[in-house]
C-alpha cells in the first residue's frame, strides 16, 4: 500500500474517533453549568479508543514491513535503481527519471543499402529471411583506428544481413571515416558520441560506454525488435562461424572469448547442455563475469526491458547491462559447440603515439607523392607533419640517407 493511502486511512479513522468523542465533550460542557458532579467516561469507551490506536499502529507497522520486504526482494532492472547509491552514481543516469546525463549523439552518415553483390558465393536474395545482426563497434581516435576498422570491415564483408553501427568517441564527425565506411558497401551508421567530461578523469576511464549507449539509443529510437545485438570491439579477431551461431539467439547466447586476462579465456561453464557457472580470473562480485564480446542478445527479448542500458563503471559494464535485461541463468543459450570452441579472440594492438614527420610545408605540394600521402595519413590520425618538431625527414637512395631537400628540390 502506498504511503498516501496509509495516511488517508489513518486520517479517516482518527476523524471517526473524534466523532465518537464529541458526545462526551458536549456532555461535559453541559454538566459544568450544574452543581451535579460529572462522571468519567465509561471504561469500555476508553478501552475501545485504545484498541483502535493499537490496531492502527500495528497495521501501519505491518504495512511498513511489507514495503521494506518488497523493496529488498524485488530486482529493479533499471540502471540507476541500483543496490547502493555509490553504484548508481556510476550509471550515468539521472536517479530520479533515468534519463542519460550530459550525453551527446550525432549521426554523421548512414546507409541502409547493401551494395555487395555476393556473400559466401551466394546472391543477396538467398539471405533475405535471416535476422539482421546489429554489430556495434565503439572506437576512438588513435594511430591504429583506421587500420583496425579496415581489418574488421574485411571480416564483416563476408557476413550477410548485417548493419554496422560505428560509434566514435569524439565531438566532430570524421569525413575520412564516412568515406571509408561507404566504400565497404555494407549497411552502416556512423555516429559520434563522446564520453561525458565528468568521466574522462576517472582512472580507469569507462572507455567505449558512451558509444555503446549511443547504439542502444539508436536501436530504441528506431523501434527495432527483430534482429540480434552484438558488441564487437574494433581490435578483436572474429571467426566467421561466430555470426552463424549468434544469429540463432532466442534470448541471450553466450560463448567463450580467448586471450582474456590470467586464464587466457573467459566464458560459461556448461553441464548437460545448460550454463551453470562461469570461468573468469576476475570475478569481483559480478553476477555475470563475461567479456563484452562473449554474448549476443535478441532484440525482441531486449525490447521487454525499457530501461536497458550500460553503466559508466569500468569492469562492470557487461554485468550491469545483462542485469538490466533481467537475465536469468536458465535463459542463457550456450554457443560454440557447448562453449568448447573459441569463436572470438580479445586481441589487442600495441598502441603508439601519433607519428611526426618534420618536413617544410613547401615540399608538400604536387612535386611528389609525399604531400598527398602525408595528408591522407593525417586524416586517418596516423601521422602528422611539422616544420619545427620531431625527427627531420630523411629520404634514402642507393642505401644512403639524404636530406629531403636534396631529393625534392
UniProtKB/Swiss-Prot annotation:
Enzymatic reactions: 3-O-(beta-D-galactosyl-(1->3)-beta-D-galactosyl-(1->4)-beta-D-xylosyl)-L-seryl-[protein] + UDP-alpha-D-glucuronate = 3-O-(beta-D-GlcA-(1->3)-beta-D-Gal-(1->3)-beta-D-Gal-(1->4)-beta-D-Xyl)-L-seryl-[protein] + UDP + H(+)
Glycosylation sites: 102, 223, 338
Gene3D superfamilies: Spore Coat Polysaccharide Biosynthesis Protein SpsA, Chain A
UniProt: Mn(2+) binding residues: 235
Any GO BP annotation: protein N-linked glycosylation
Positions in the Cytoplasmic compartment: 1-53
Pathway: Protein modification; protein glycosylation
EC number: 2.4.1.135
Residues modified to Phosphothreonine: 11
A Gene Ontology cellular-component term: Golgi membrane
Top-level taxon of the source organism: Eukaryota
Composition bias, Basic and acidic residues: 398-409
Transmembrane segments: 54-73
UniProt-recorded name of the protein: Galactosylgalactosylxylosylprotein 3-beta-glucuronosyltransferase S
Gene for this chain: GlcAT-S
Amino acid at each position: 500500500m502506498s504511503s498516501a493511502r496509509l495516511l488517508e486511512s489513518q486520517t479517516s479513522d482518527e476523524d471517526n474517533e473524534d466523532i465518537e468523542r464529541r458526545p462526551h465533550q458536549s456532555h461535559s460542557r453541559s454538566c459544568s453549568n450544574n452543581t451535579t458532579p460529572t462522571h468519567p467516561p465509561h471504561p469500555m469507551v476508553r478501552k475501545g479508543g485504545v484498541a483502535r490506536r493499537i490496531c492502527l499502529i500495528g497495521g501501519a507497522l505491518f504495512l511498513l514491513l511489507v514495503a521494506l520486504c518488497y523493496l529488498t526482494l524485488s530486482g529493479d532492472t533499471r540502471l540507476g535503481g541500483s543496490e547502493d547509491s555509490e553504484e548508481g552514481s556510476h550509471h550515468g543516469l539521472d536517479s530520479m527519471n533515468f534519463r542519460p546525463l550530459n550525453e551527446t549523439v550525432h549521426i554523421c552518415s548512414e546507409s541502409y543499402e547493401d551494395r555487395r553483390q555476393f556473400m559466401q558465393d551466394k546472391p543477396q536474395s538467398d539471405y533475405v529471411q535471416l535476422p539482421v545482426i546489429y554489430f556495434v563497434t565503439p572506437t576512438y581516435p588513435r594511430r591504429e583506428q583506421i587500420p583496425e576498422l579496415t581489418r574488421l570491415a574485411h571480416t564483416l564483408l563476408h557476413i550477410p544481413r548485417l548493419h554496422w553501427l560505428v560509434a566514435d568517441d569524439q565531438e566532430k564527425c570524421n569525413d575520412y571515416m564516412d568515406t571509408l565506411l561507404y566504400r565497404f558497401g555494407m549497411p552502416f551508421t556512423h555516429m559520434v558520441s563522446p564520453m561525458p567530461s565528468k568521466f574522462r578523469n576517472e582512472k580507469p576511464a569507462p572507455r567505449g560506454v558512451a558509444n555503446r549507449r549511443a547504439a542502444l539509443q539508436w536501436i530504441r529510437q528506431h523501434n527495432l525488435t527483430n534482429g540480434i545485438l552484438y558488441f564487437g570491439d574494433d581490435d578483436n579477431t572474429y571467426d566467421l562461424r561466430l555470426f552463424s551461431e549468434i544469429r540463432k539467439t532466442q534470448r541471450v547466447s553466450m560463448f567463450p572469448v580467448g586471450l582474456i586476462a590470467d586464464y587466457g579465456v573467459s566464458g560459461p561453464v556448461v553441464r548437460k547442455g545448460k550454463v551453470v557457472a562461469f570461468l573468469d580470473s576476475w570475478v569481483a562480485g559480478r553476477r555475470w563475469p563475461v567479456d563484452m564480446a562473449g554474448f549476443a542478445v535478441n532484440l525482441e527479448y531486449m525490447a521487454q526491458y525499457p530501461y536497458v542500458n550500460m553503466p559508466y563503471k569500468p569492469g562492470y559494464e557487461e554485468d550491469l547491462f545483462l542485469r538490466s535485461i533481467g537475465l536469468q541463468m536458465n535463459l542463457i543459450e550456450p554457443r560454440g559447440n557447448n562453449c568448447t570452441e573459441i569463436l572470438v579472440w580479445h586481441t589487442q594492438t600495441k598502441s603508439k603515439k601519433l607519428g611526426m614527420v618534420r618536413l617544410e610545408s613547401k615540399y608538400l605540394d604536387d612535386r611528389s607523392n609525399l604531400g598527398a600521402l602525408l595528408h591522407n595519413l593525417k586524416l586517418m590520425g596516423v601521422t602528422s607533419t611539422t616544420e619545427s618538431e620531431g625527427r627531420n625527414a630523411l629520404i634514402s637512395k642507393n642505401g644512403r640517407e639524404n636530406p629531403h631537400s636534396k631529393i625534392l628540390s
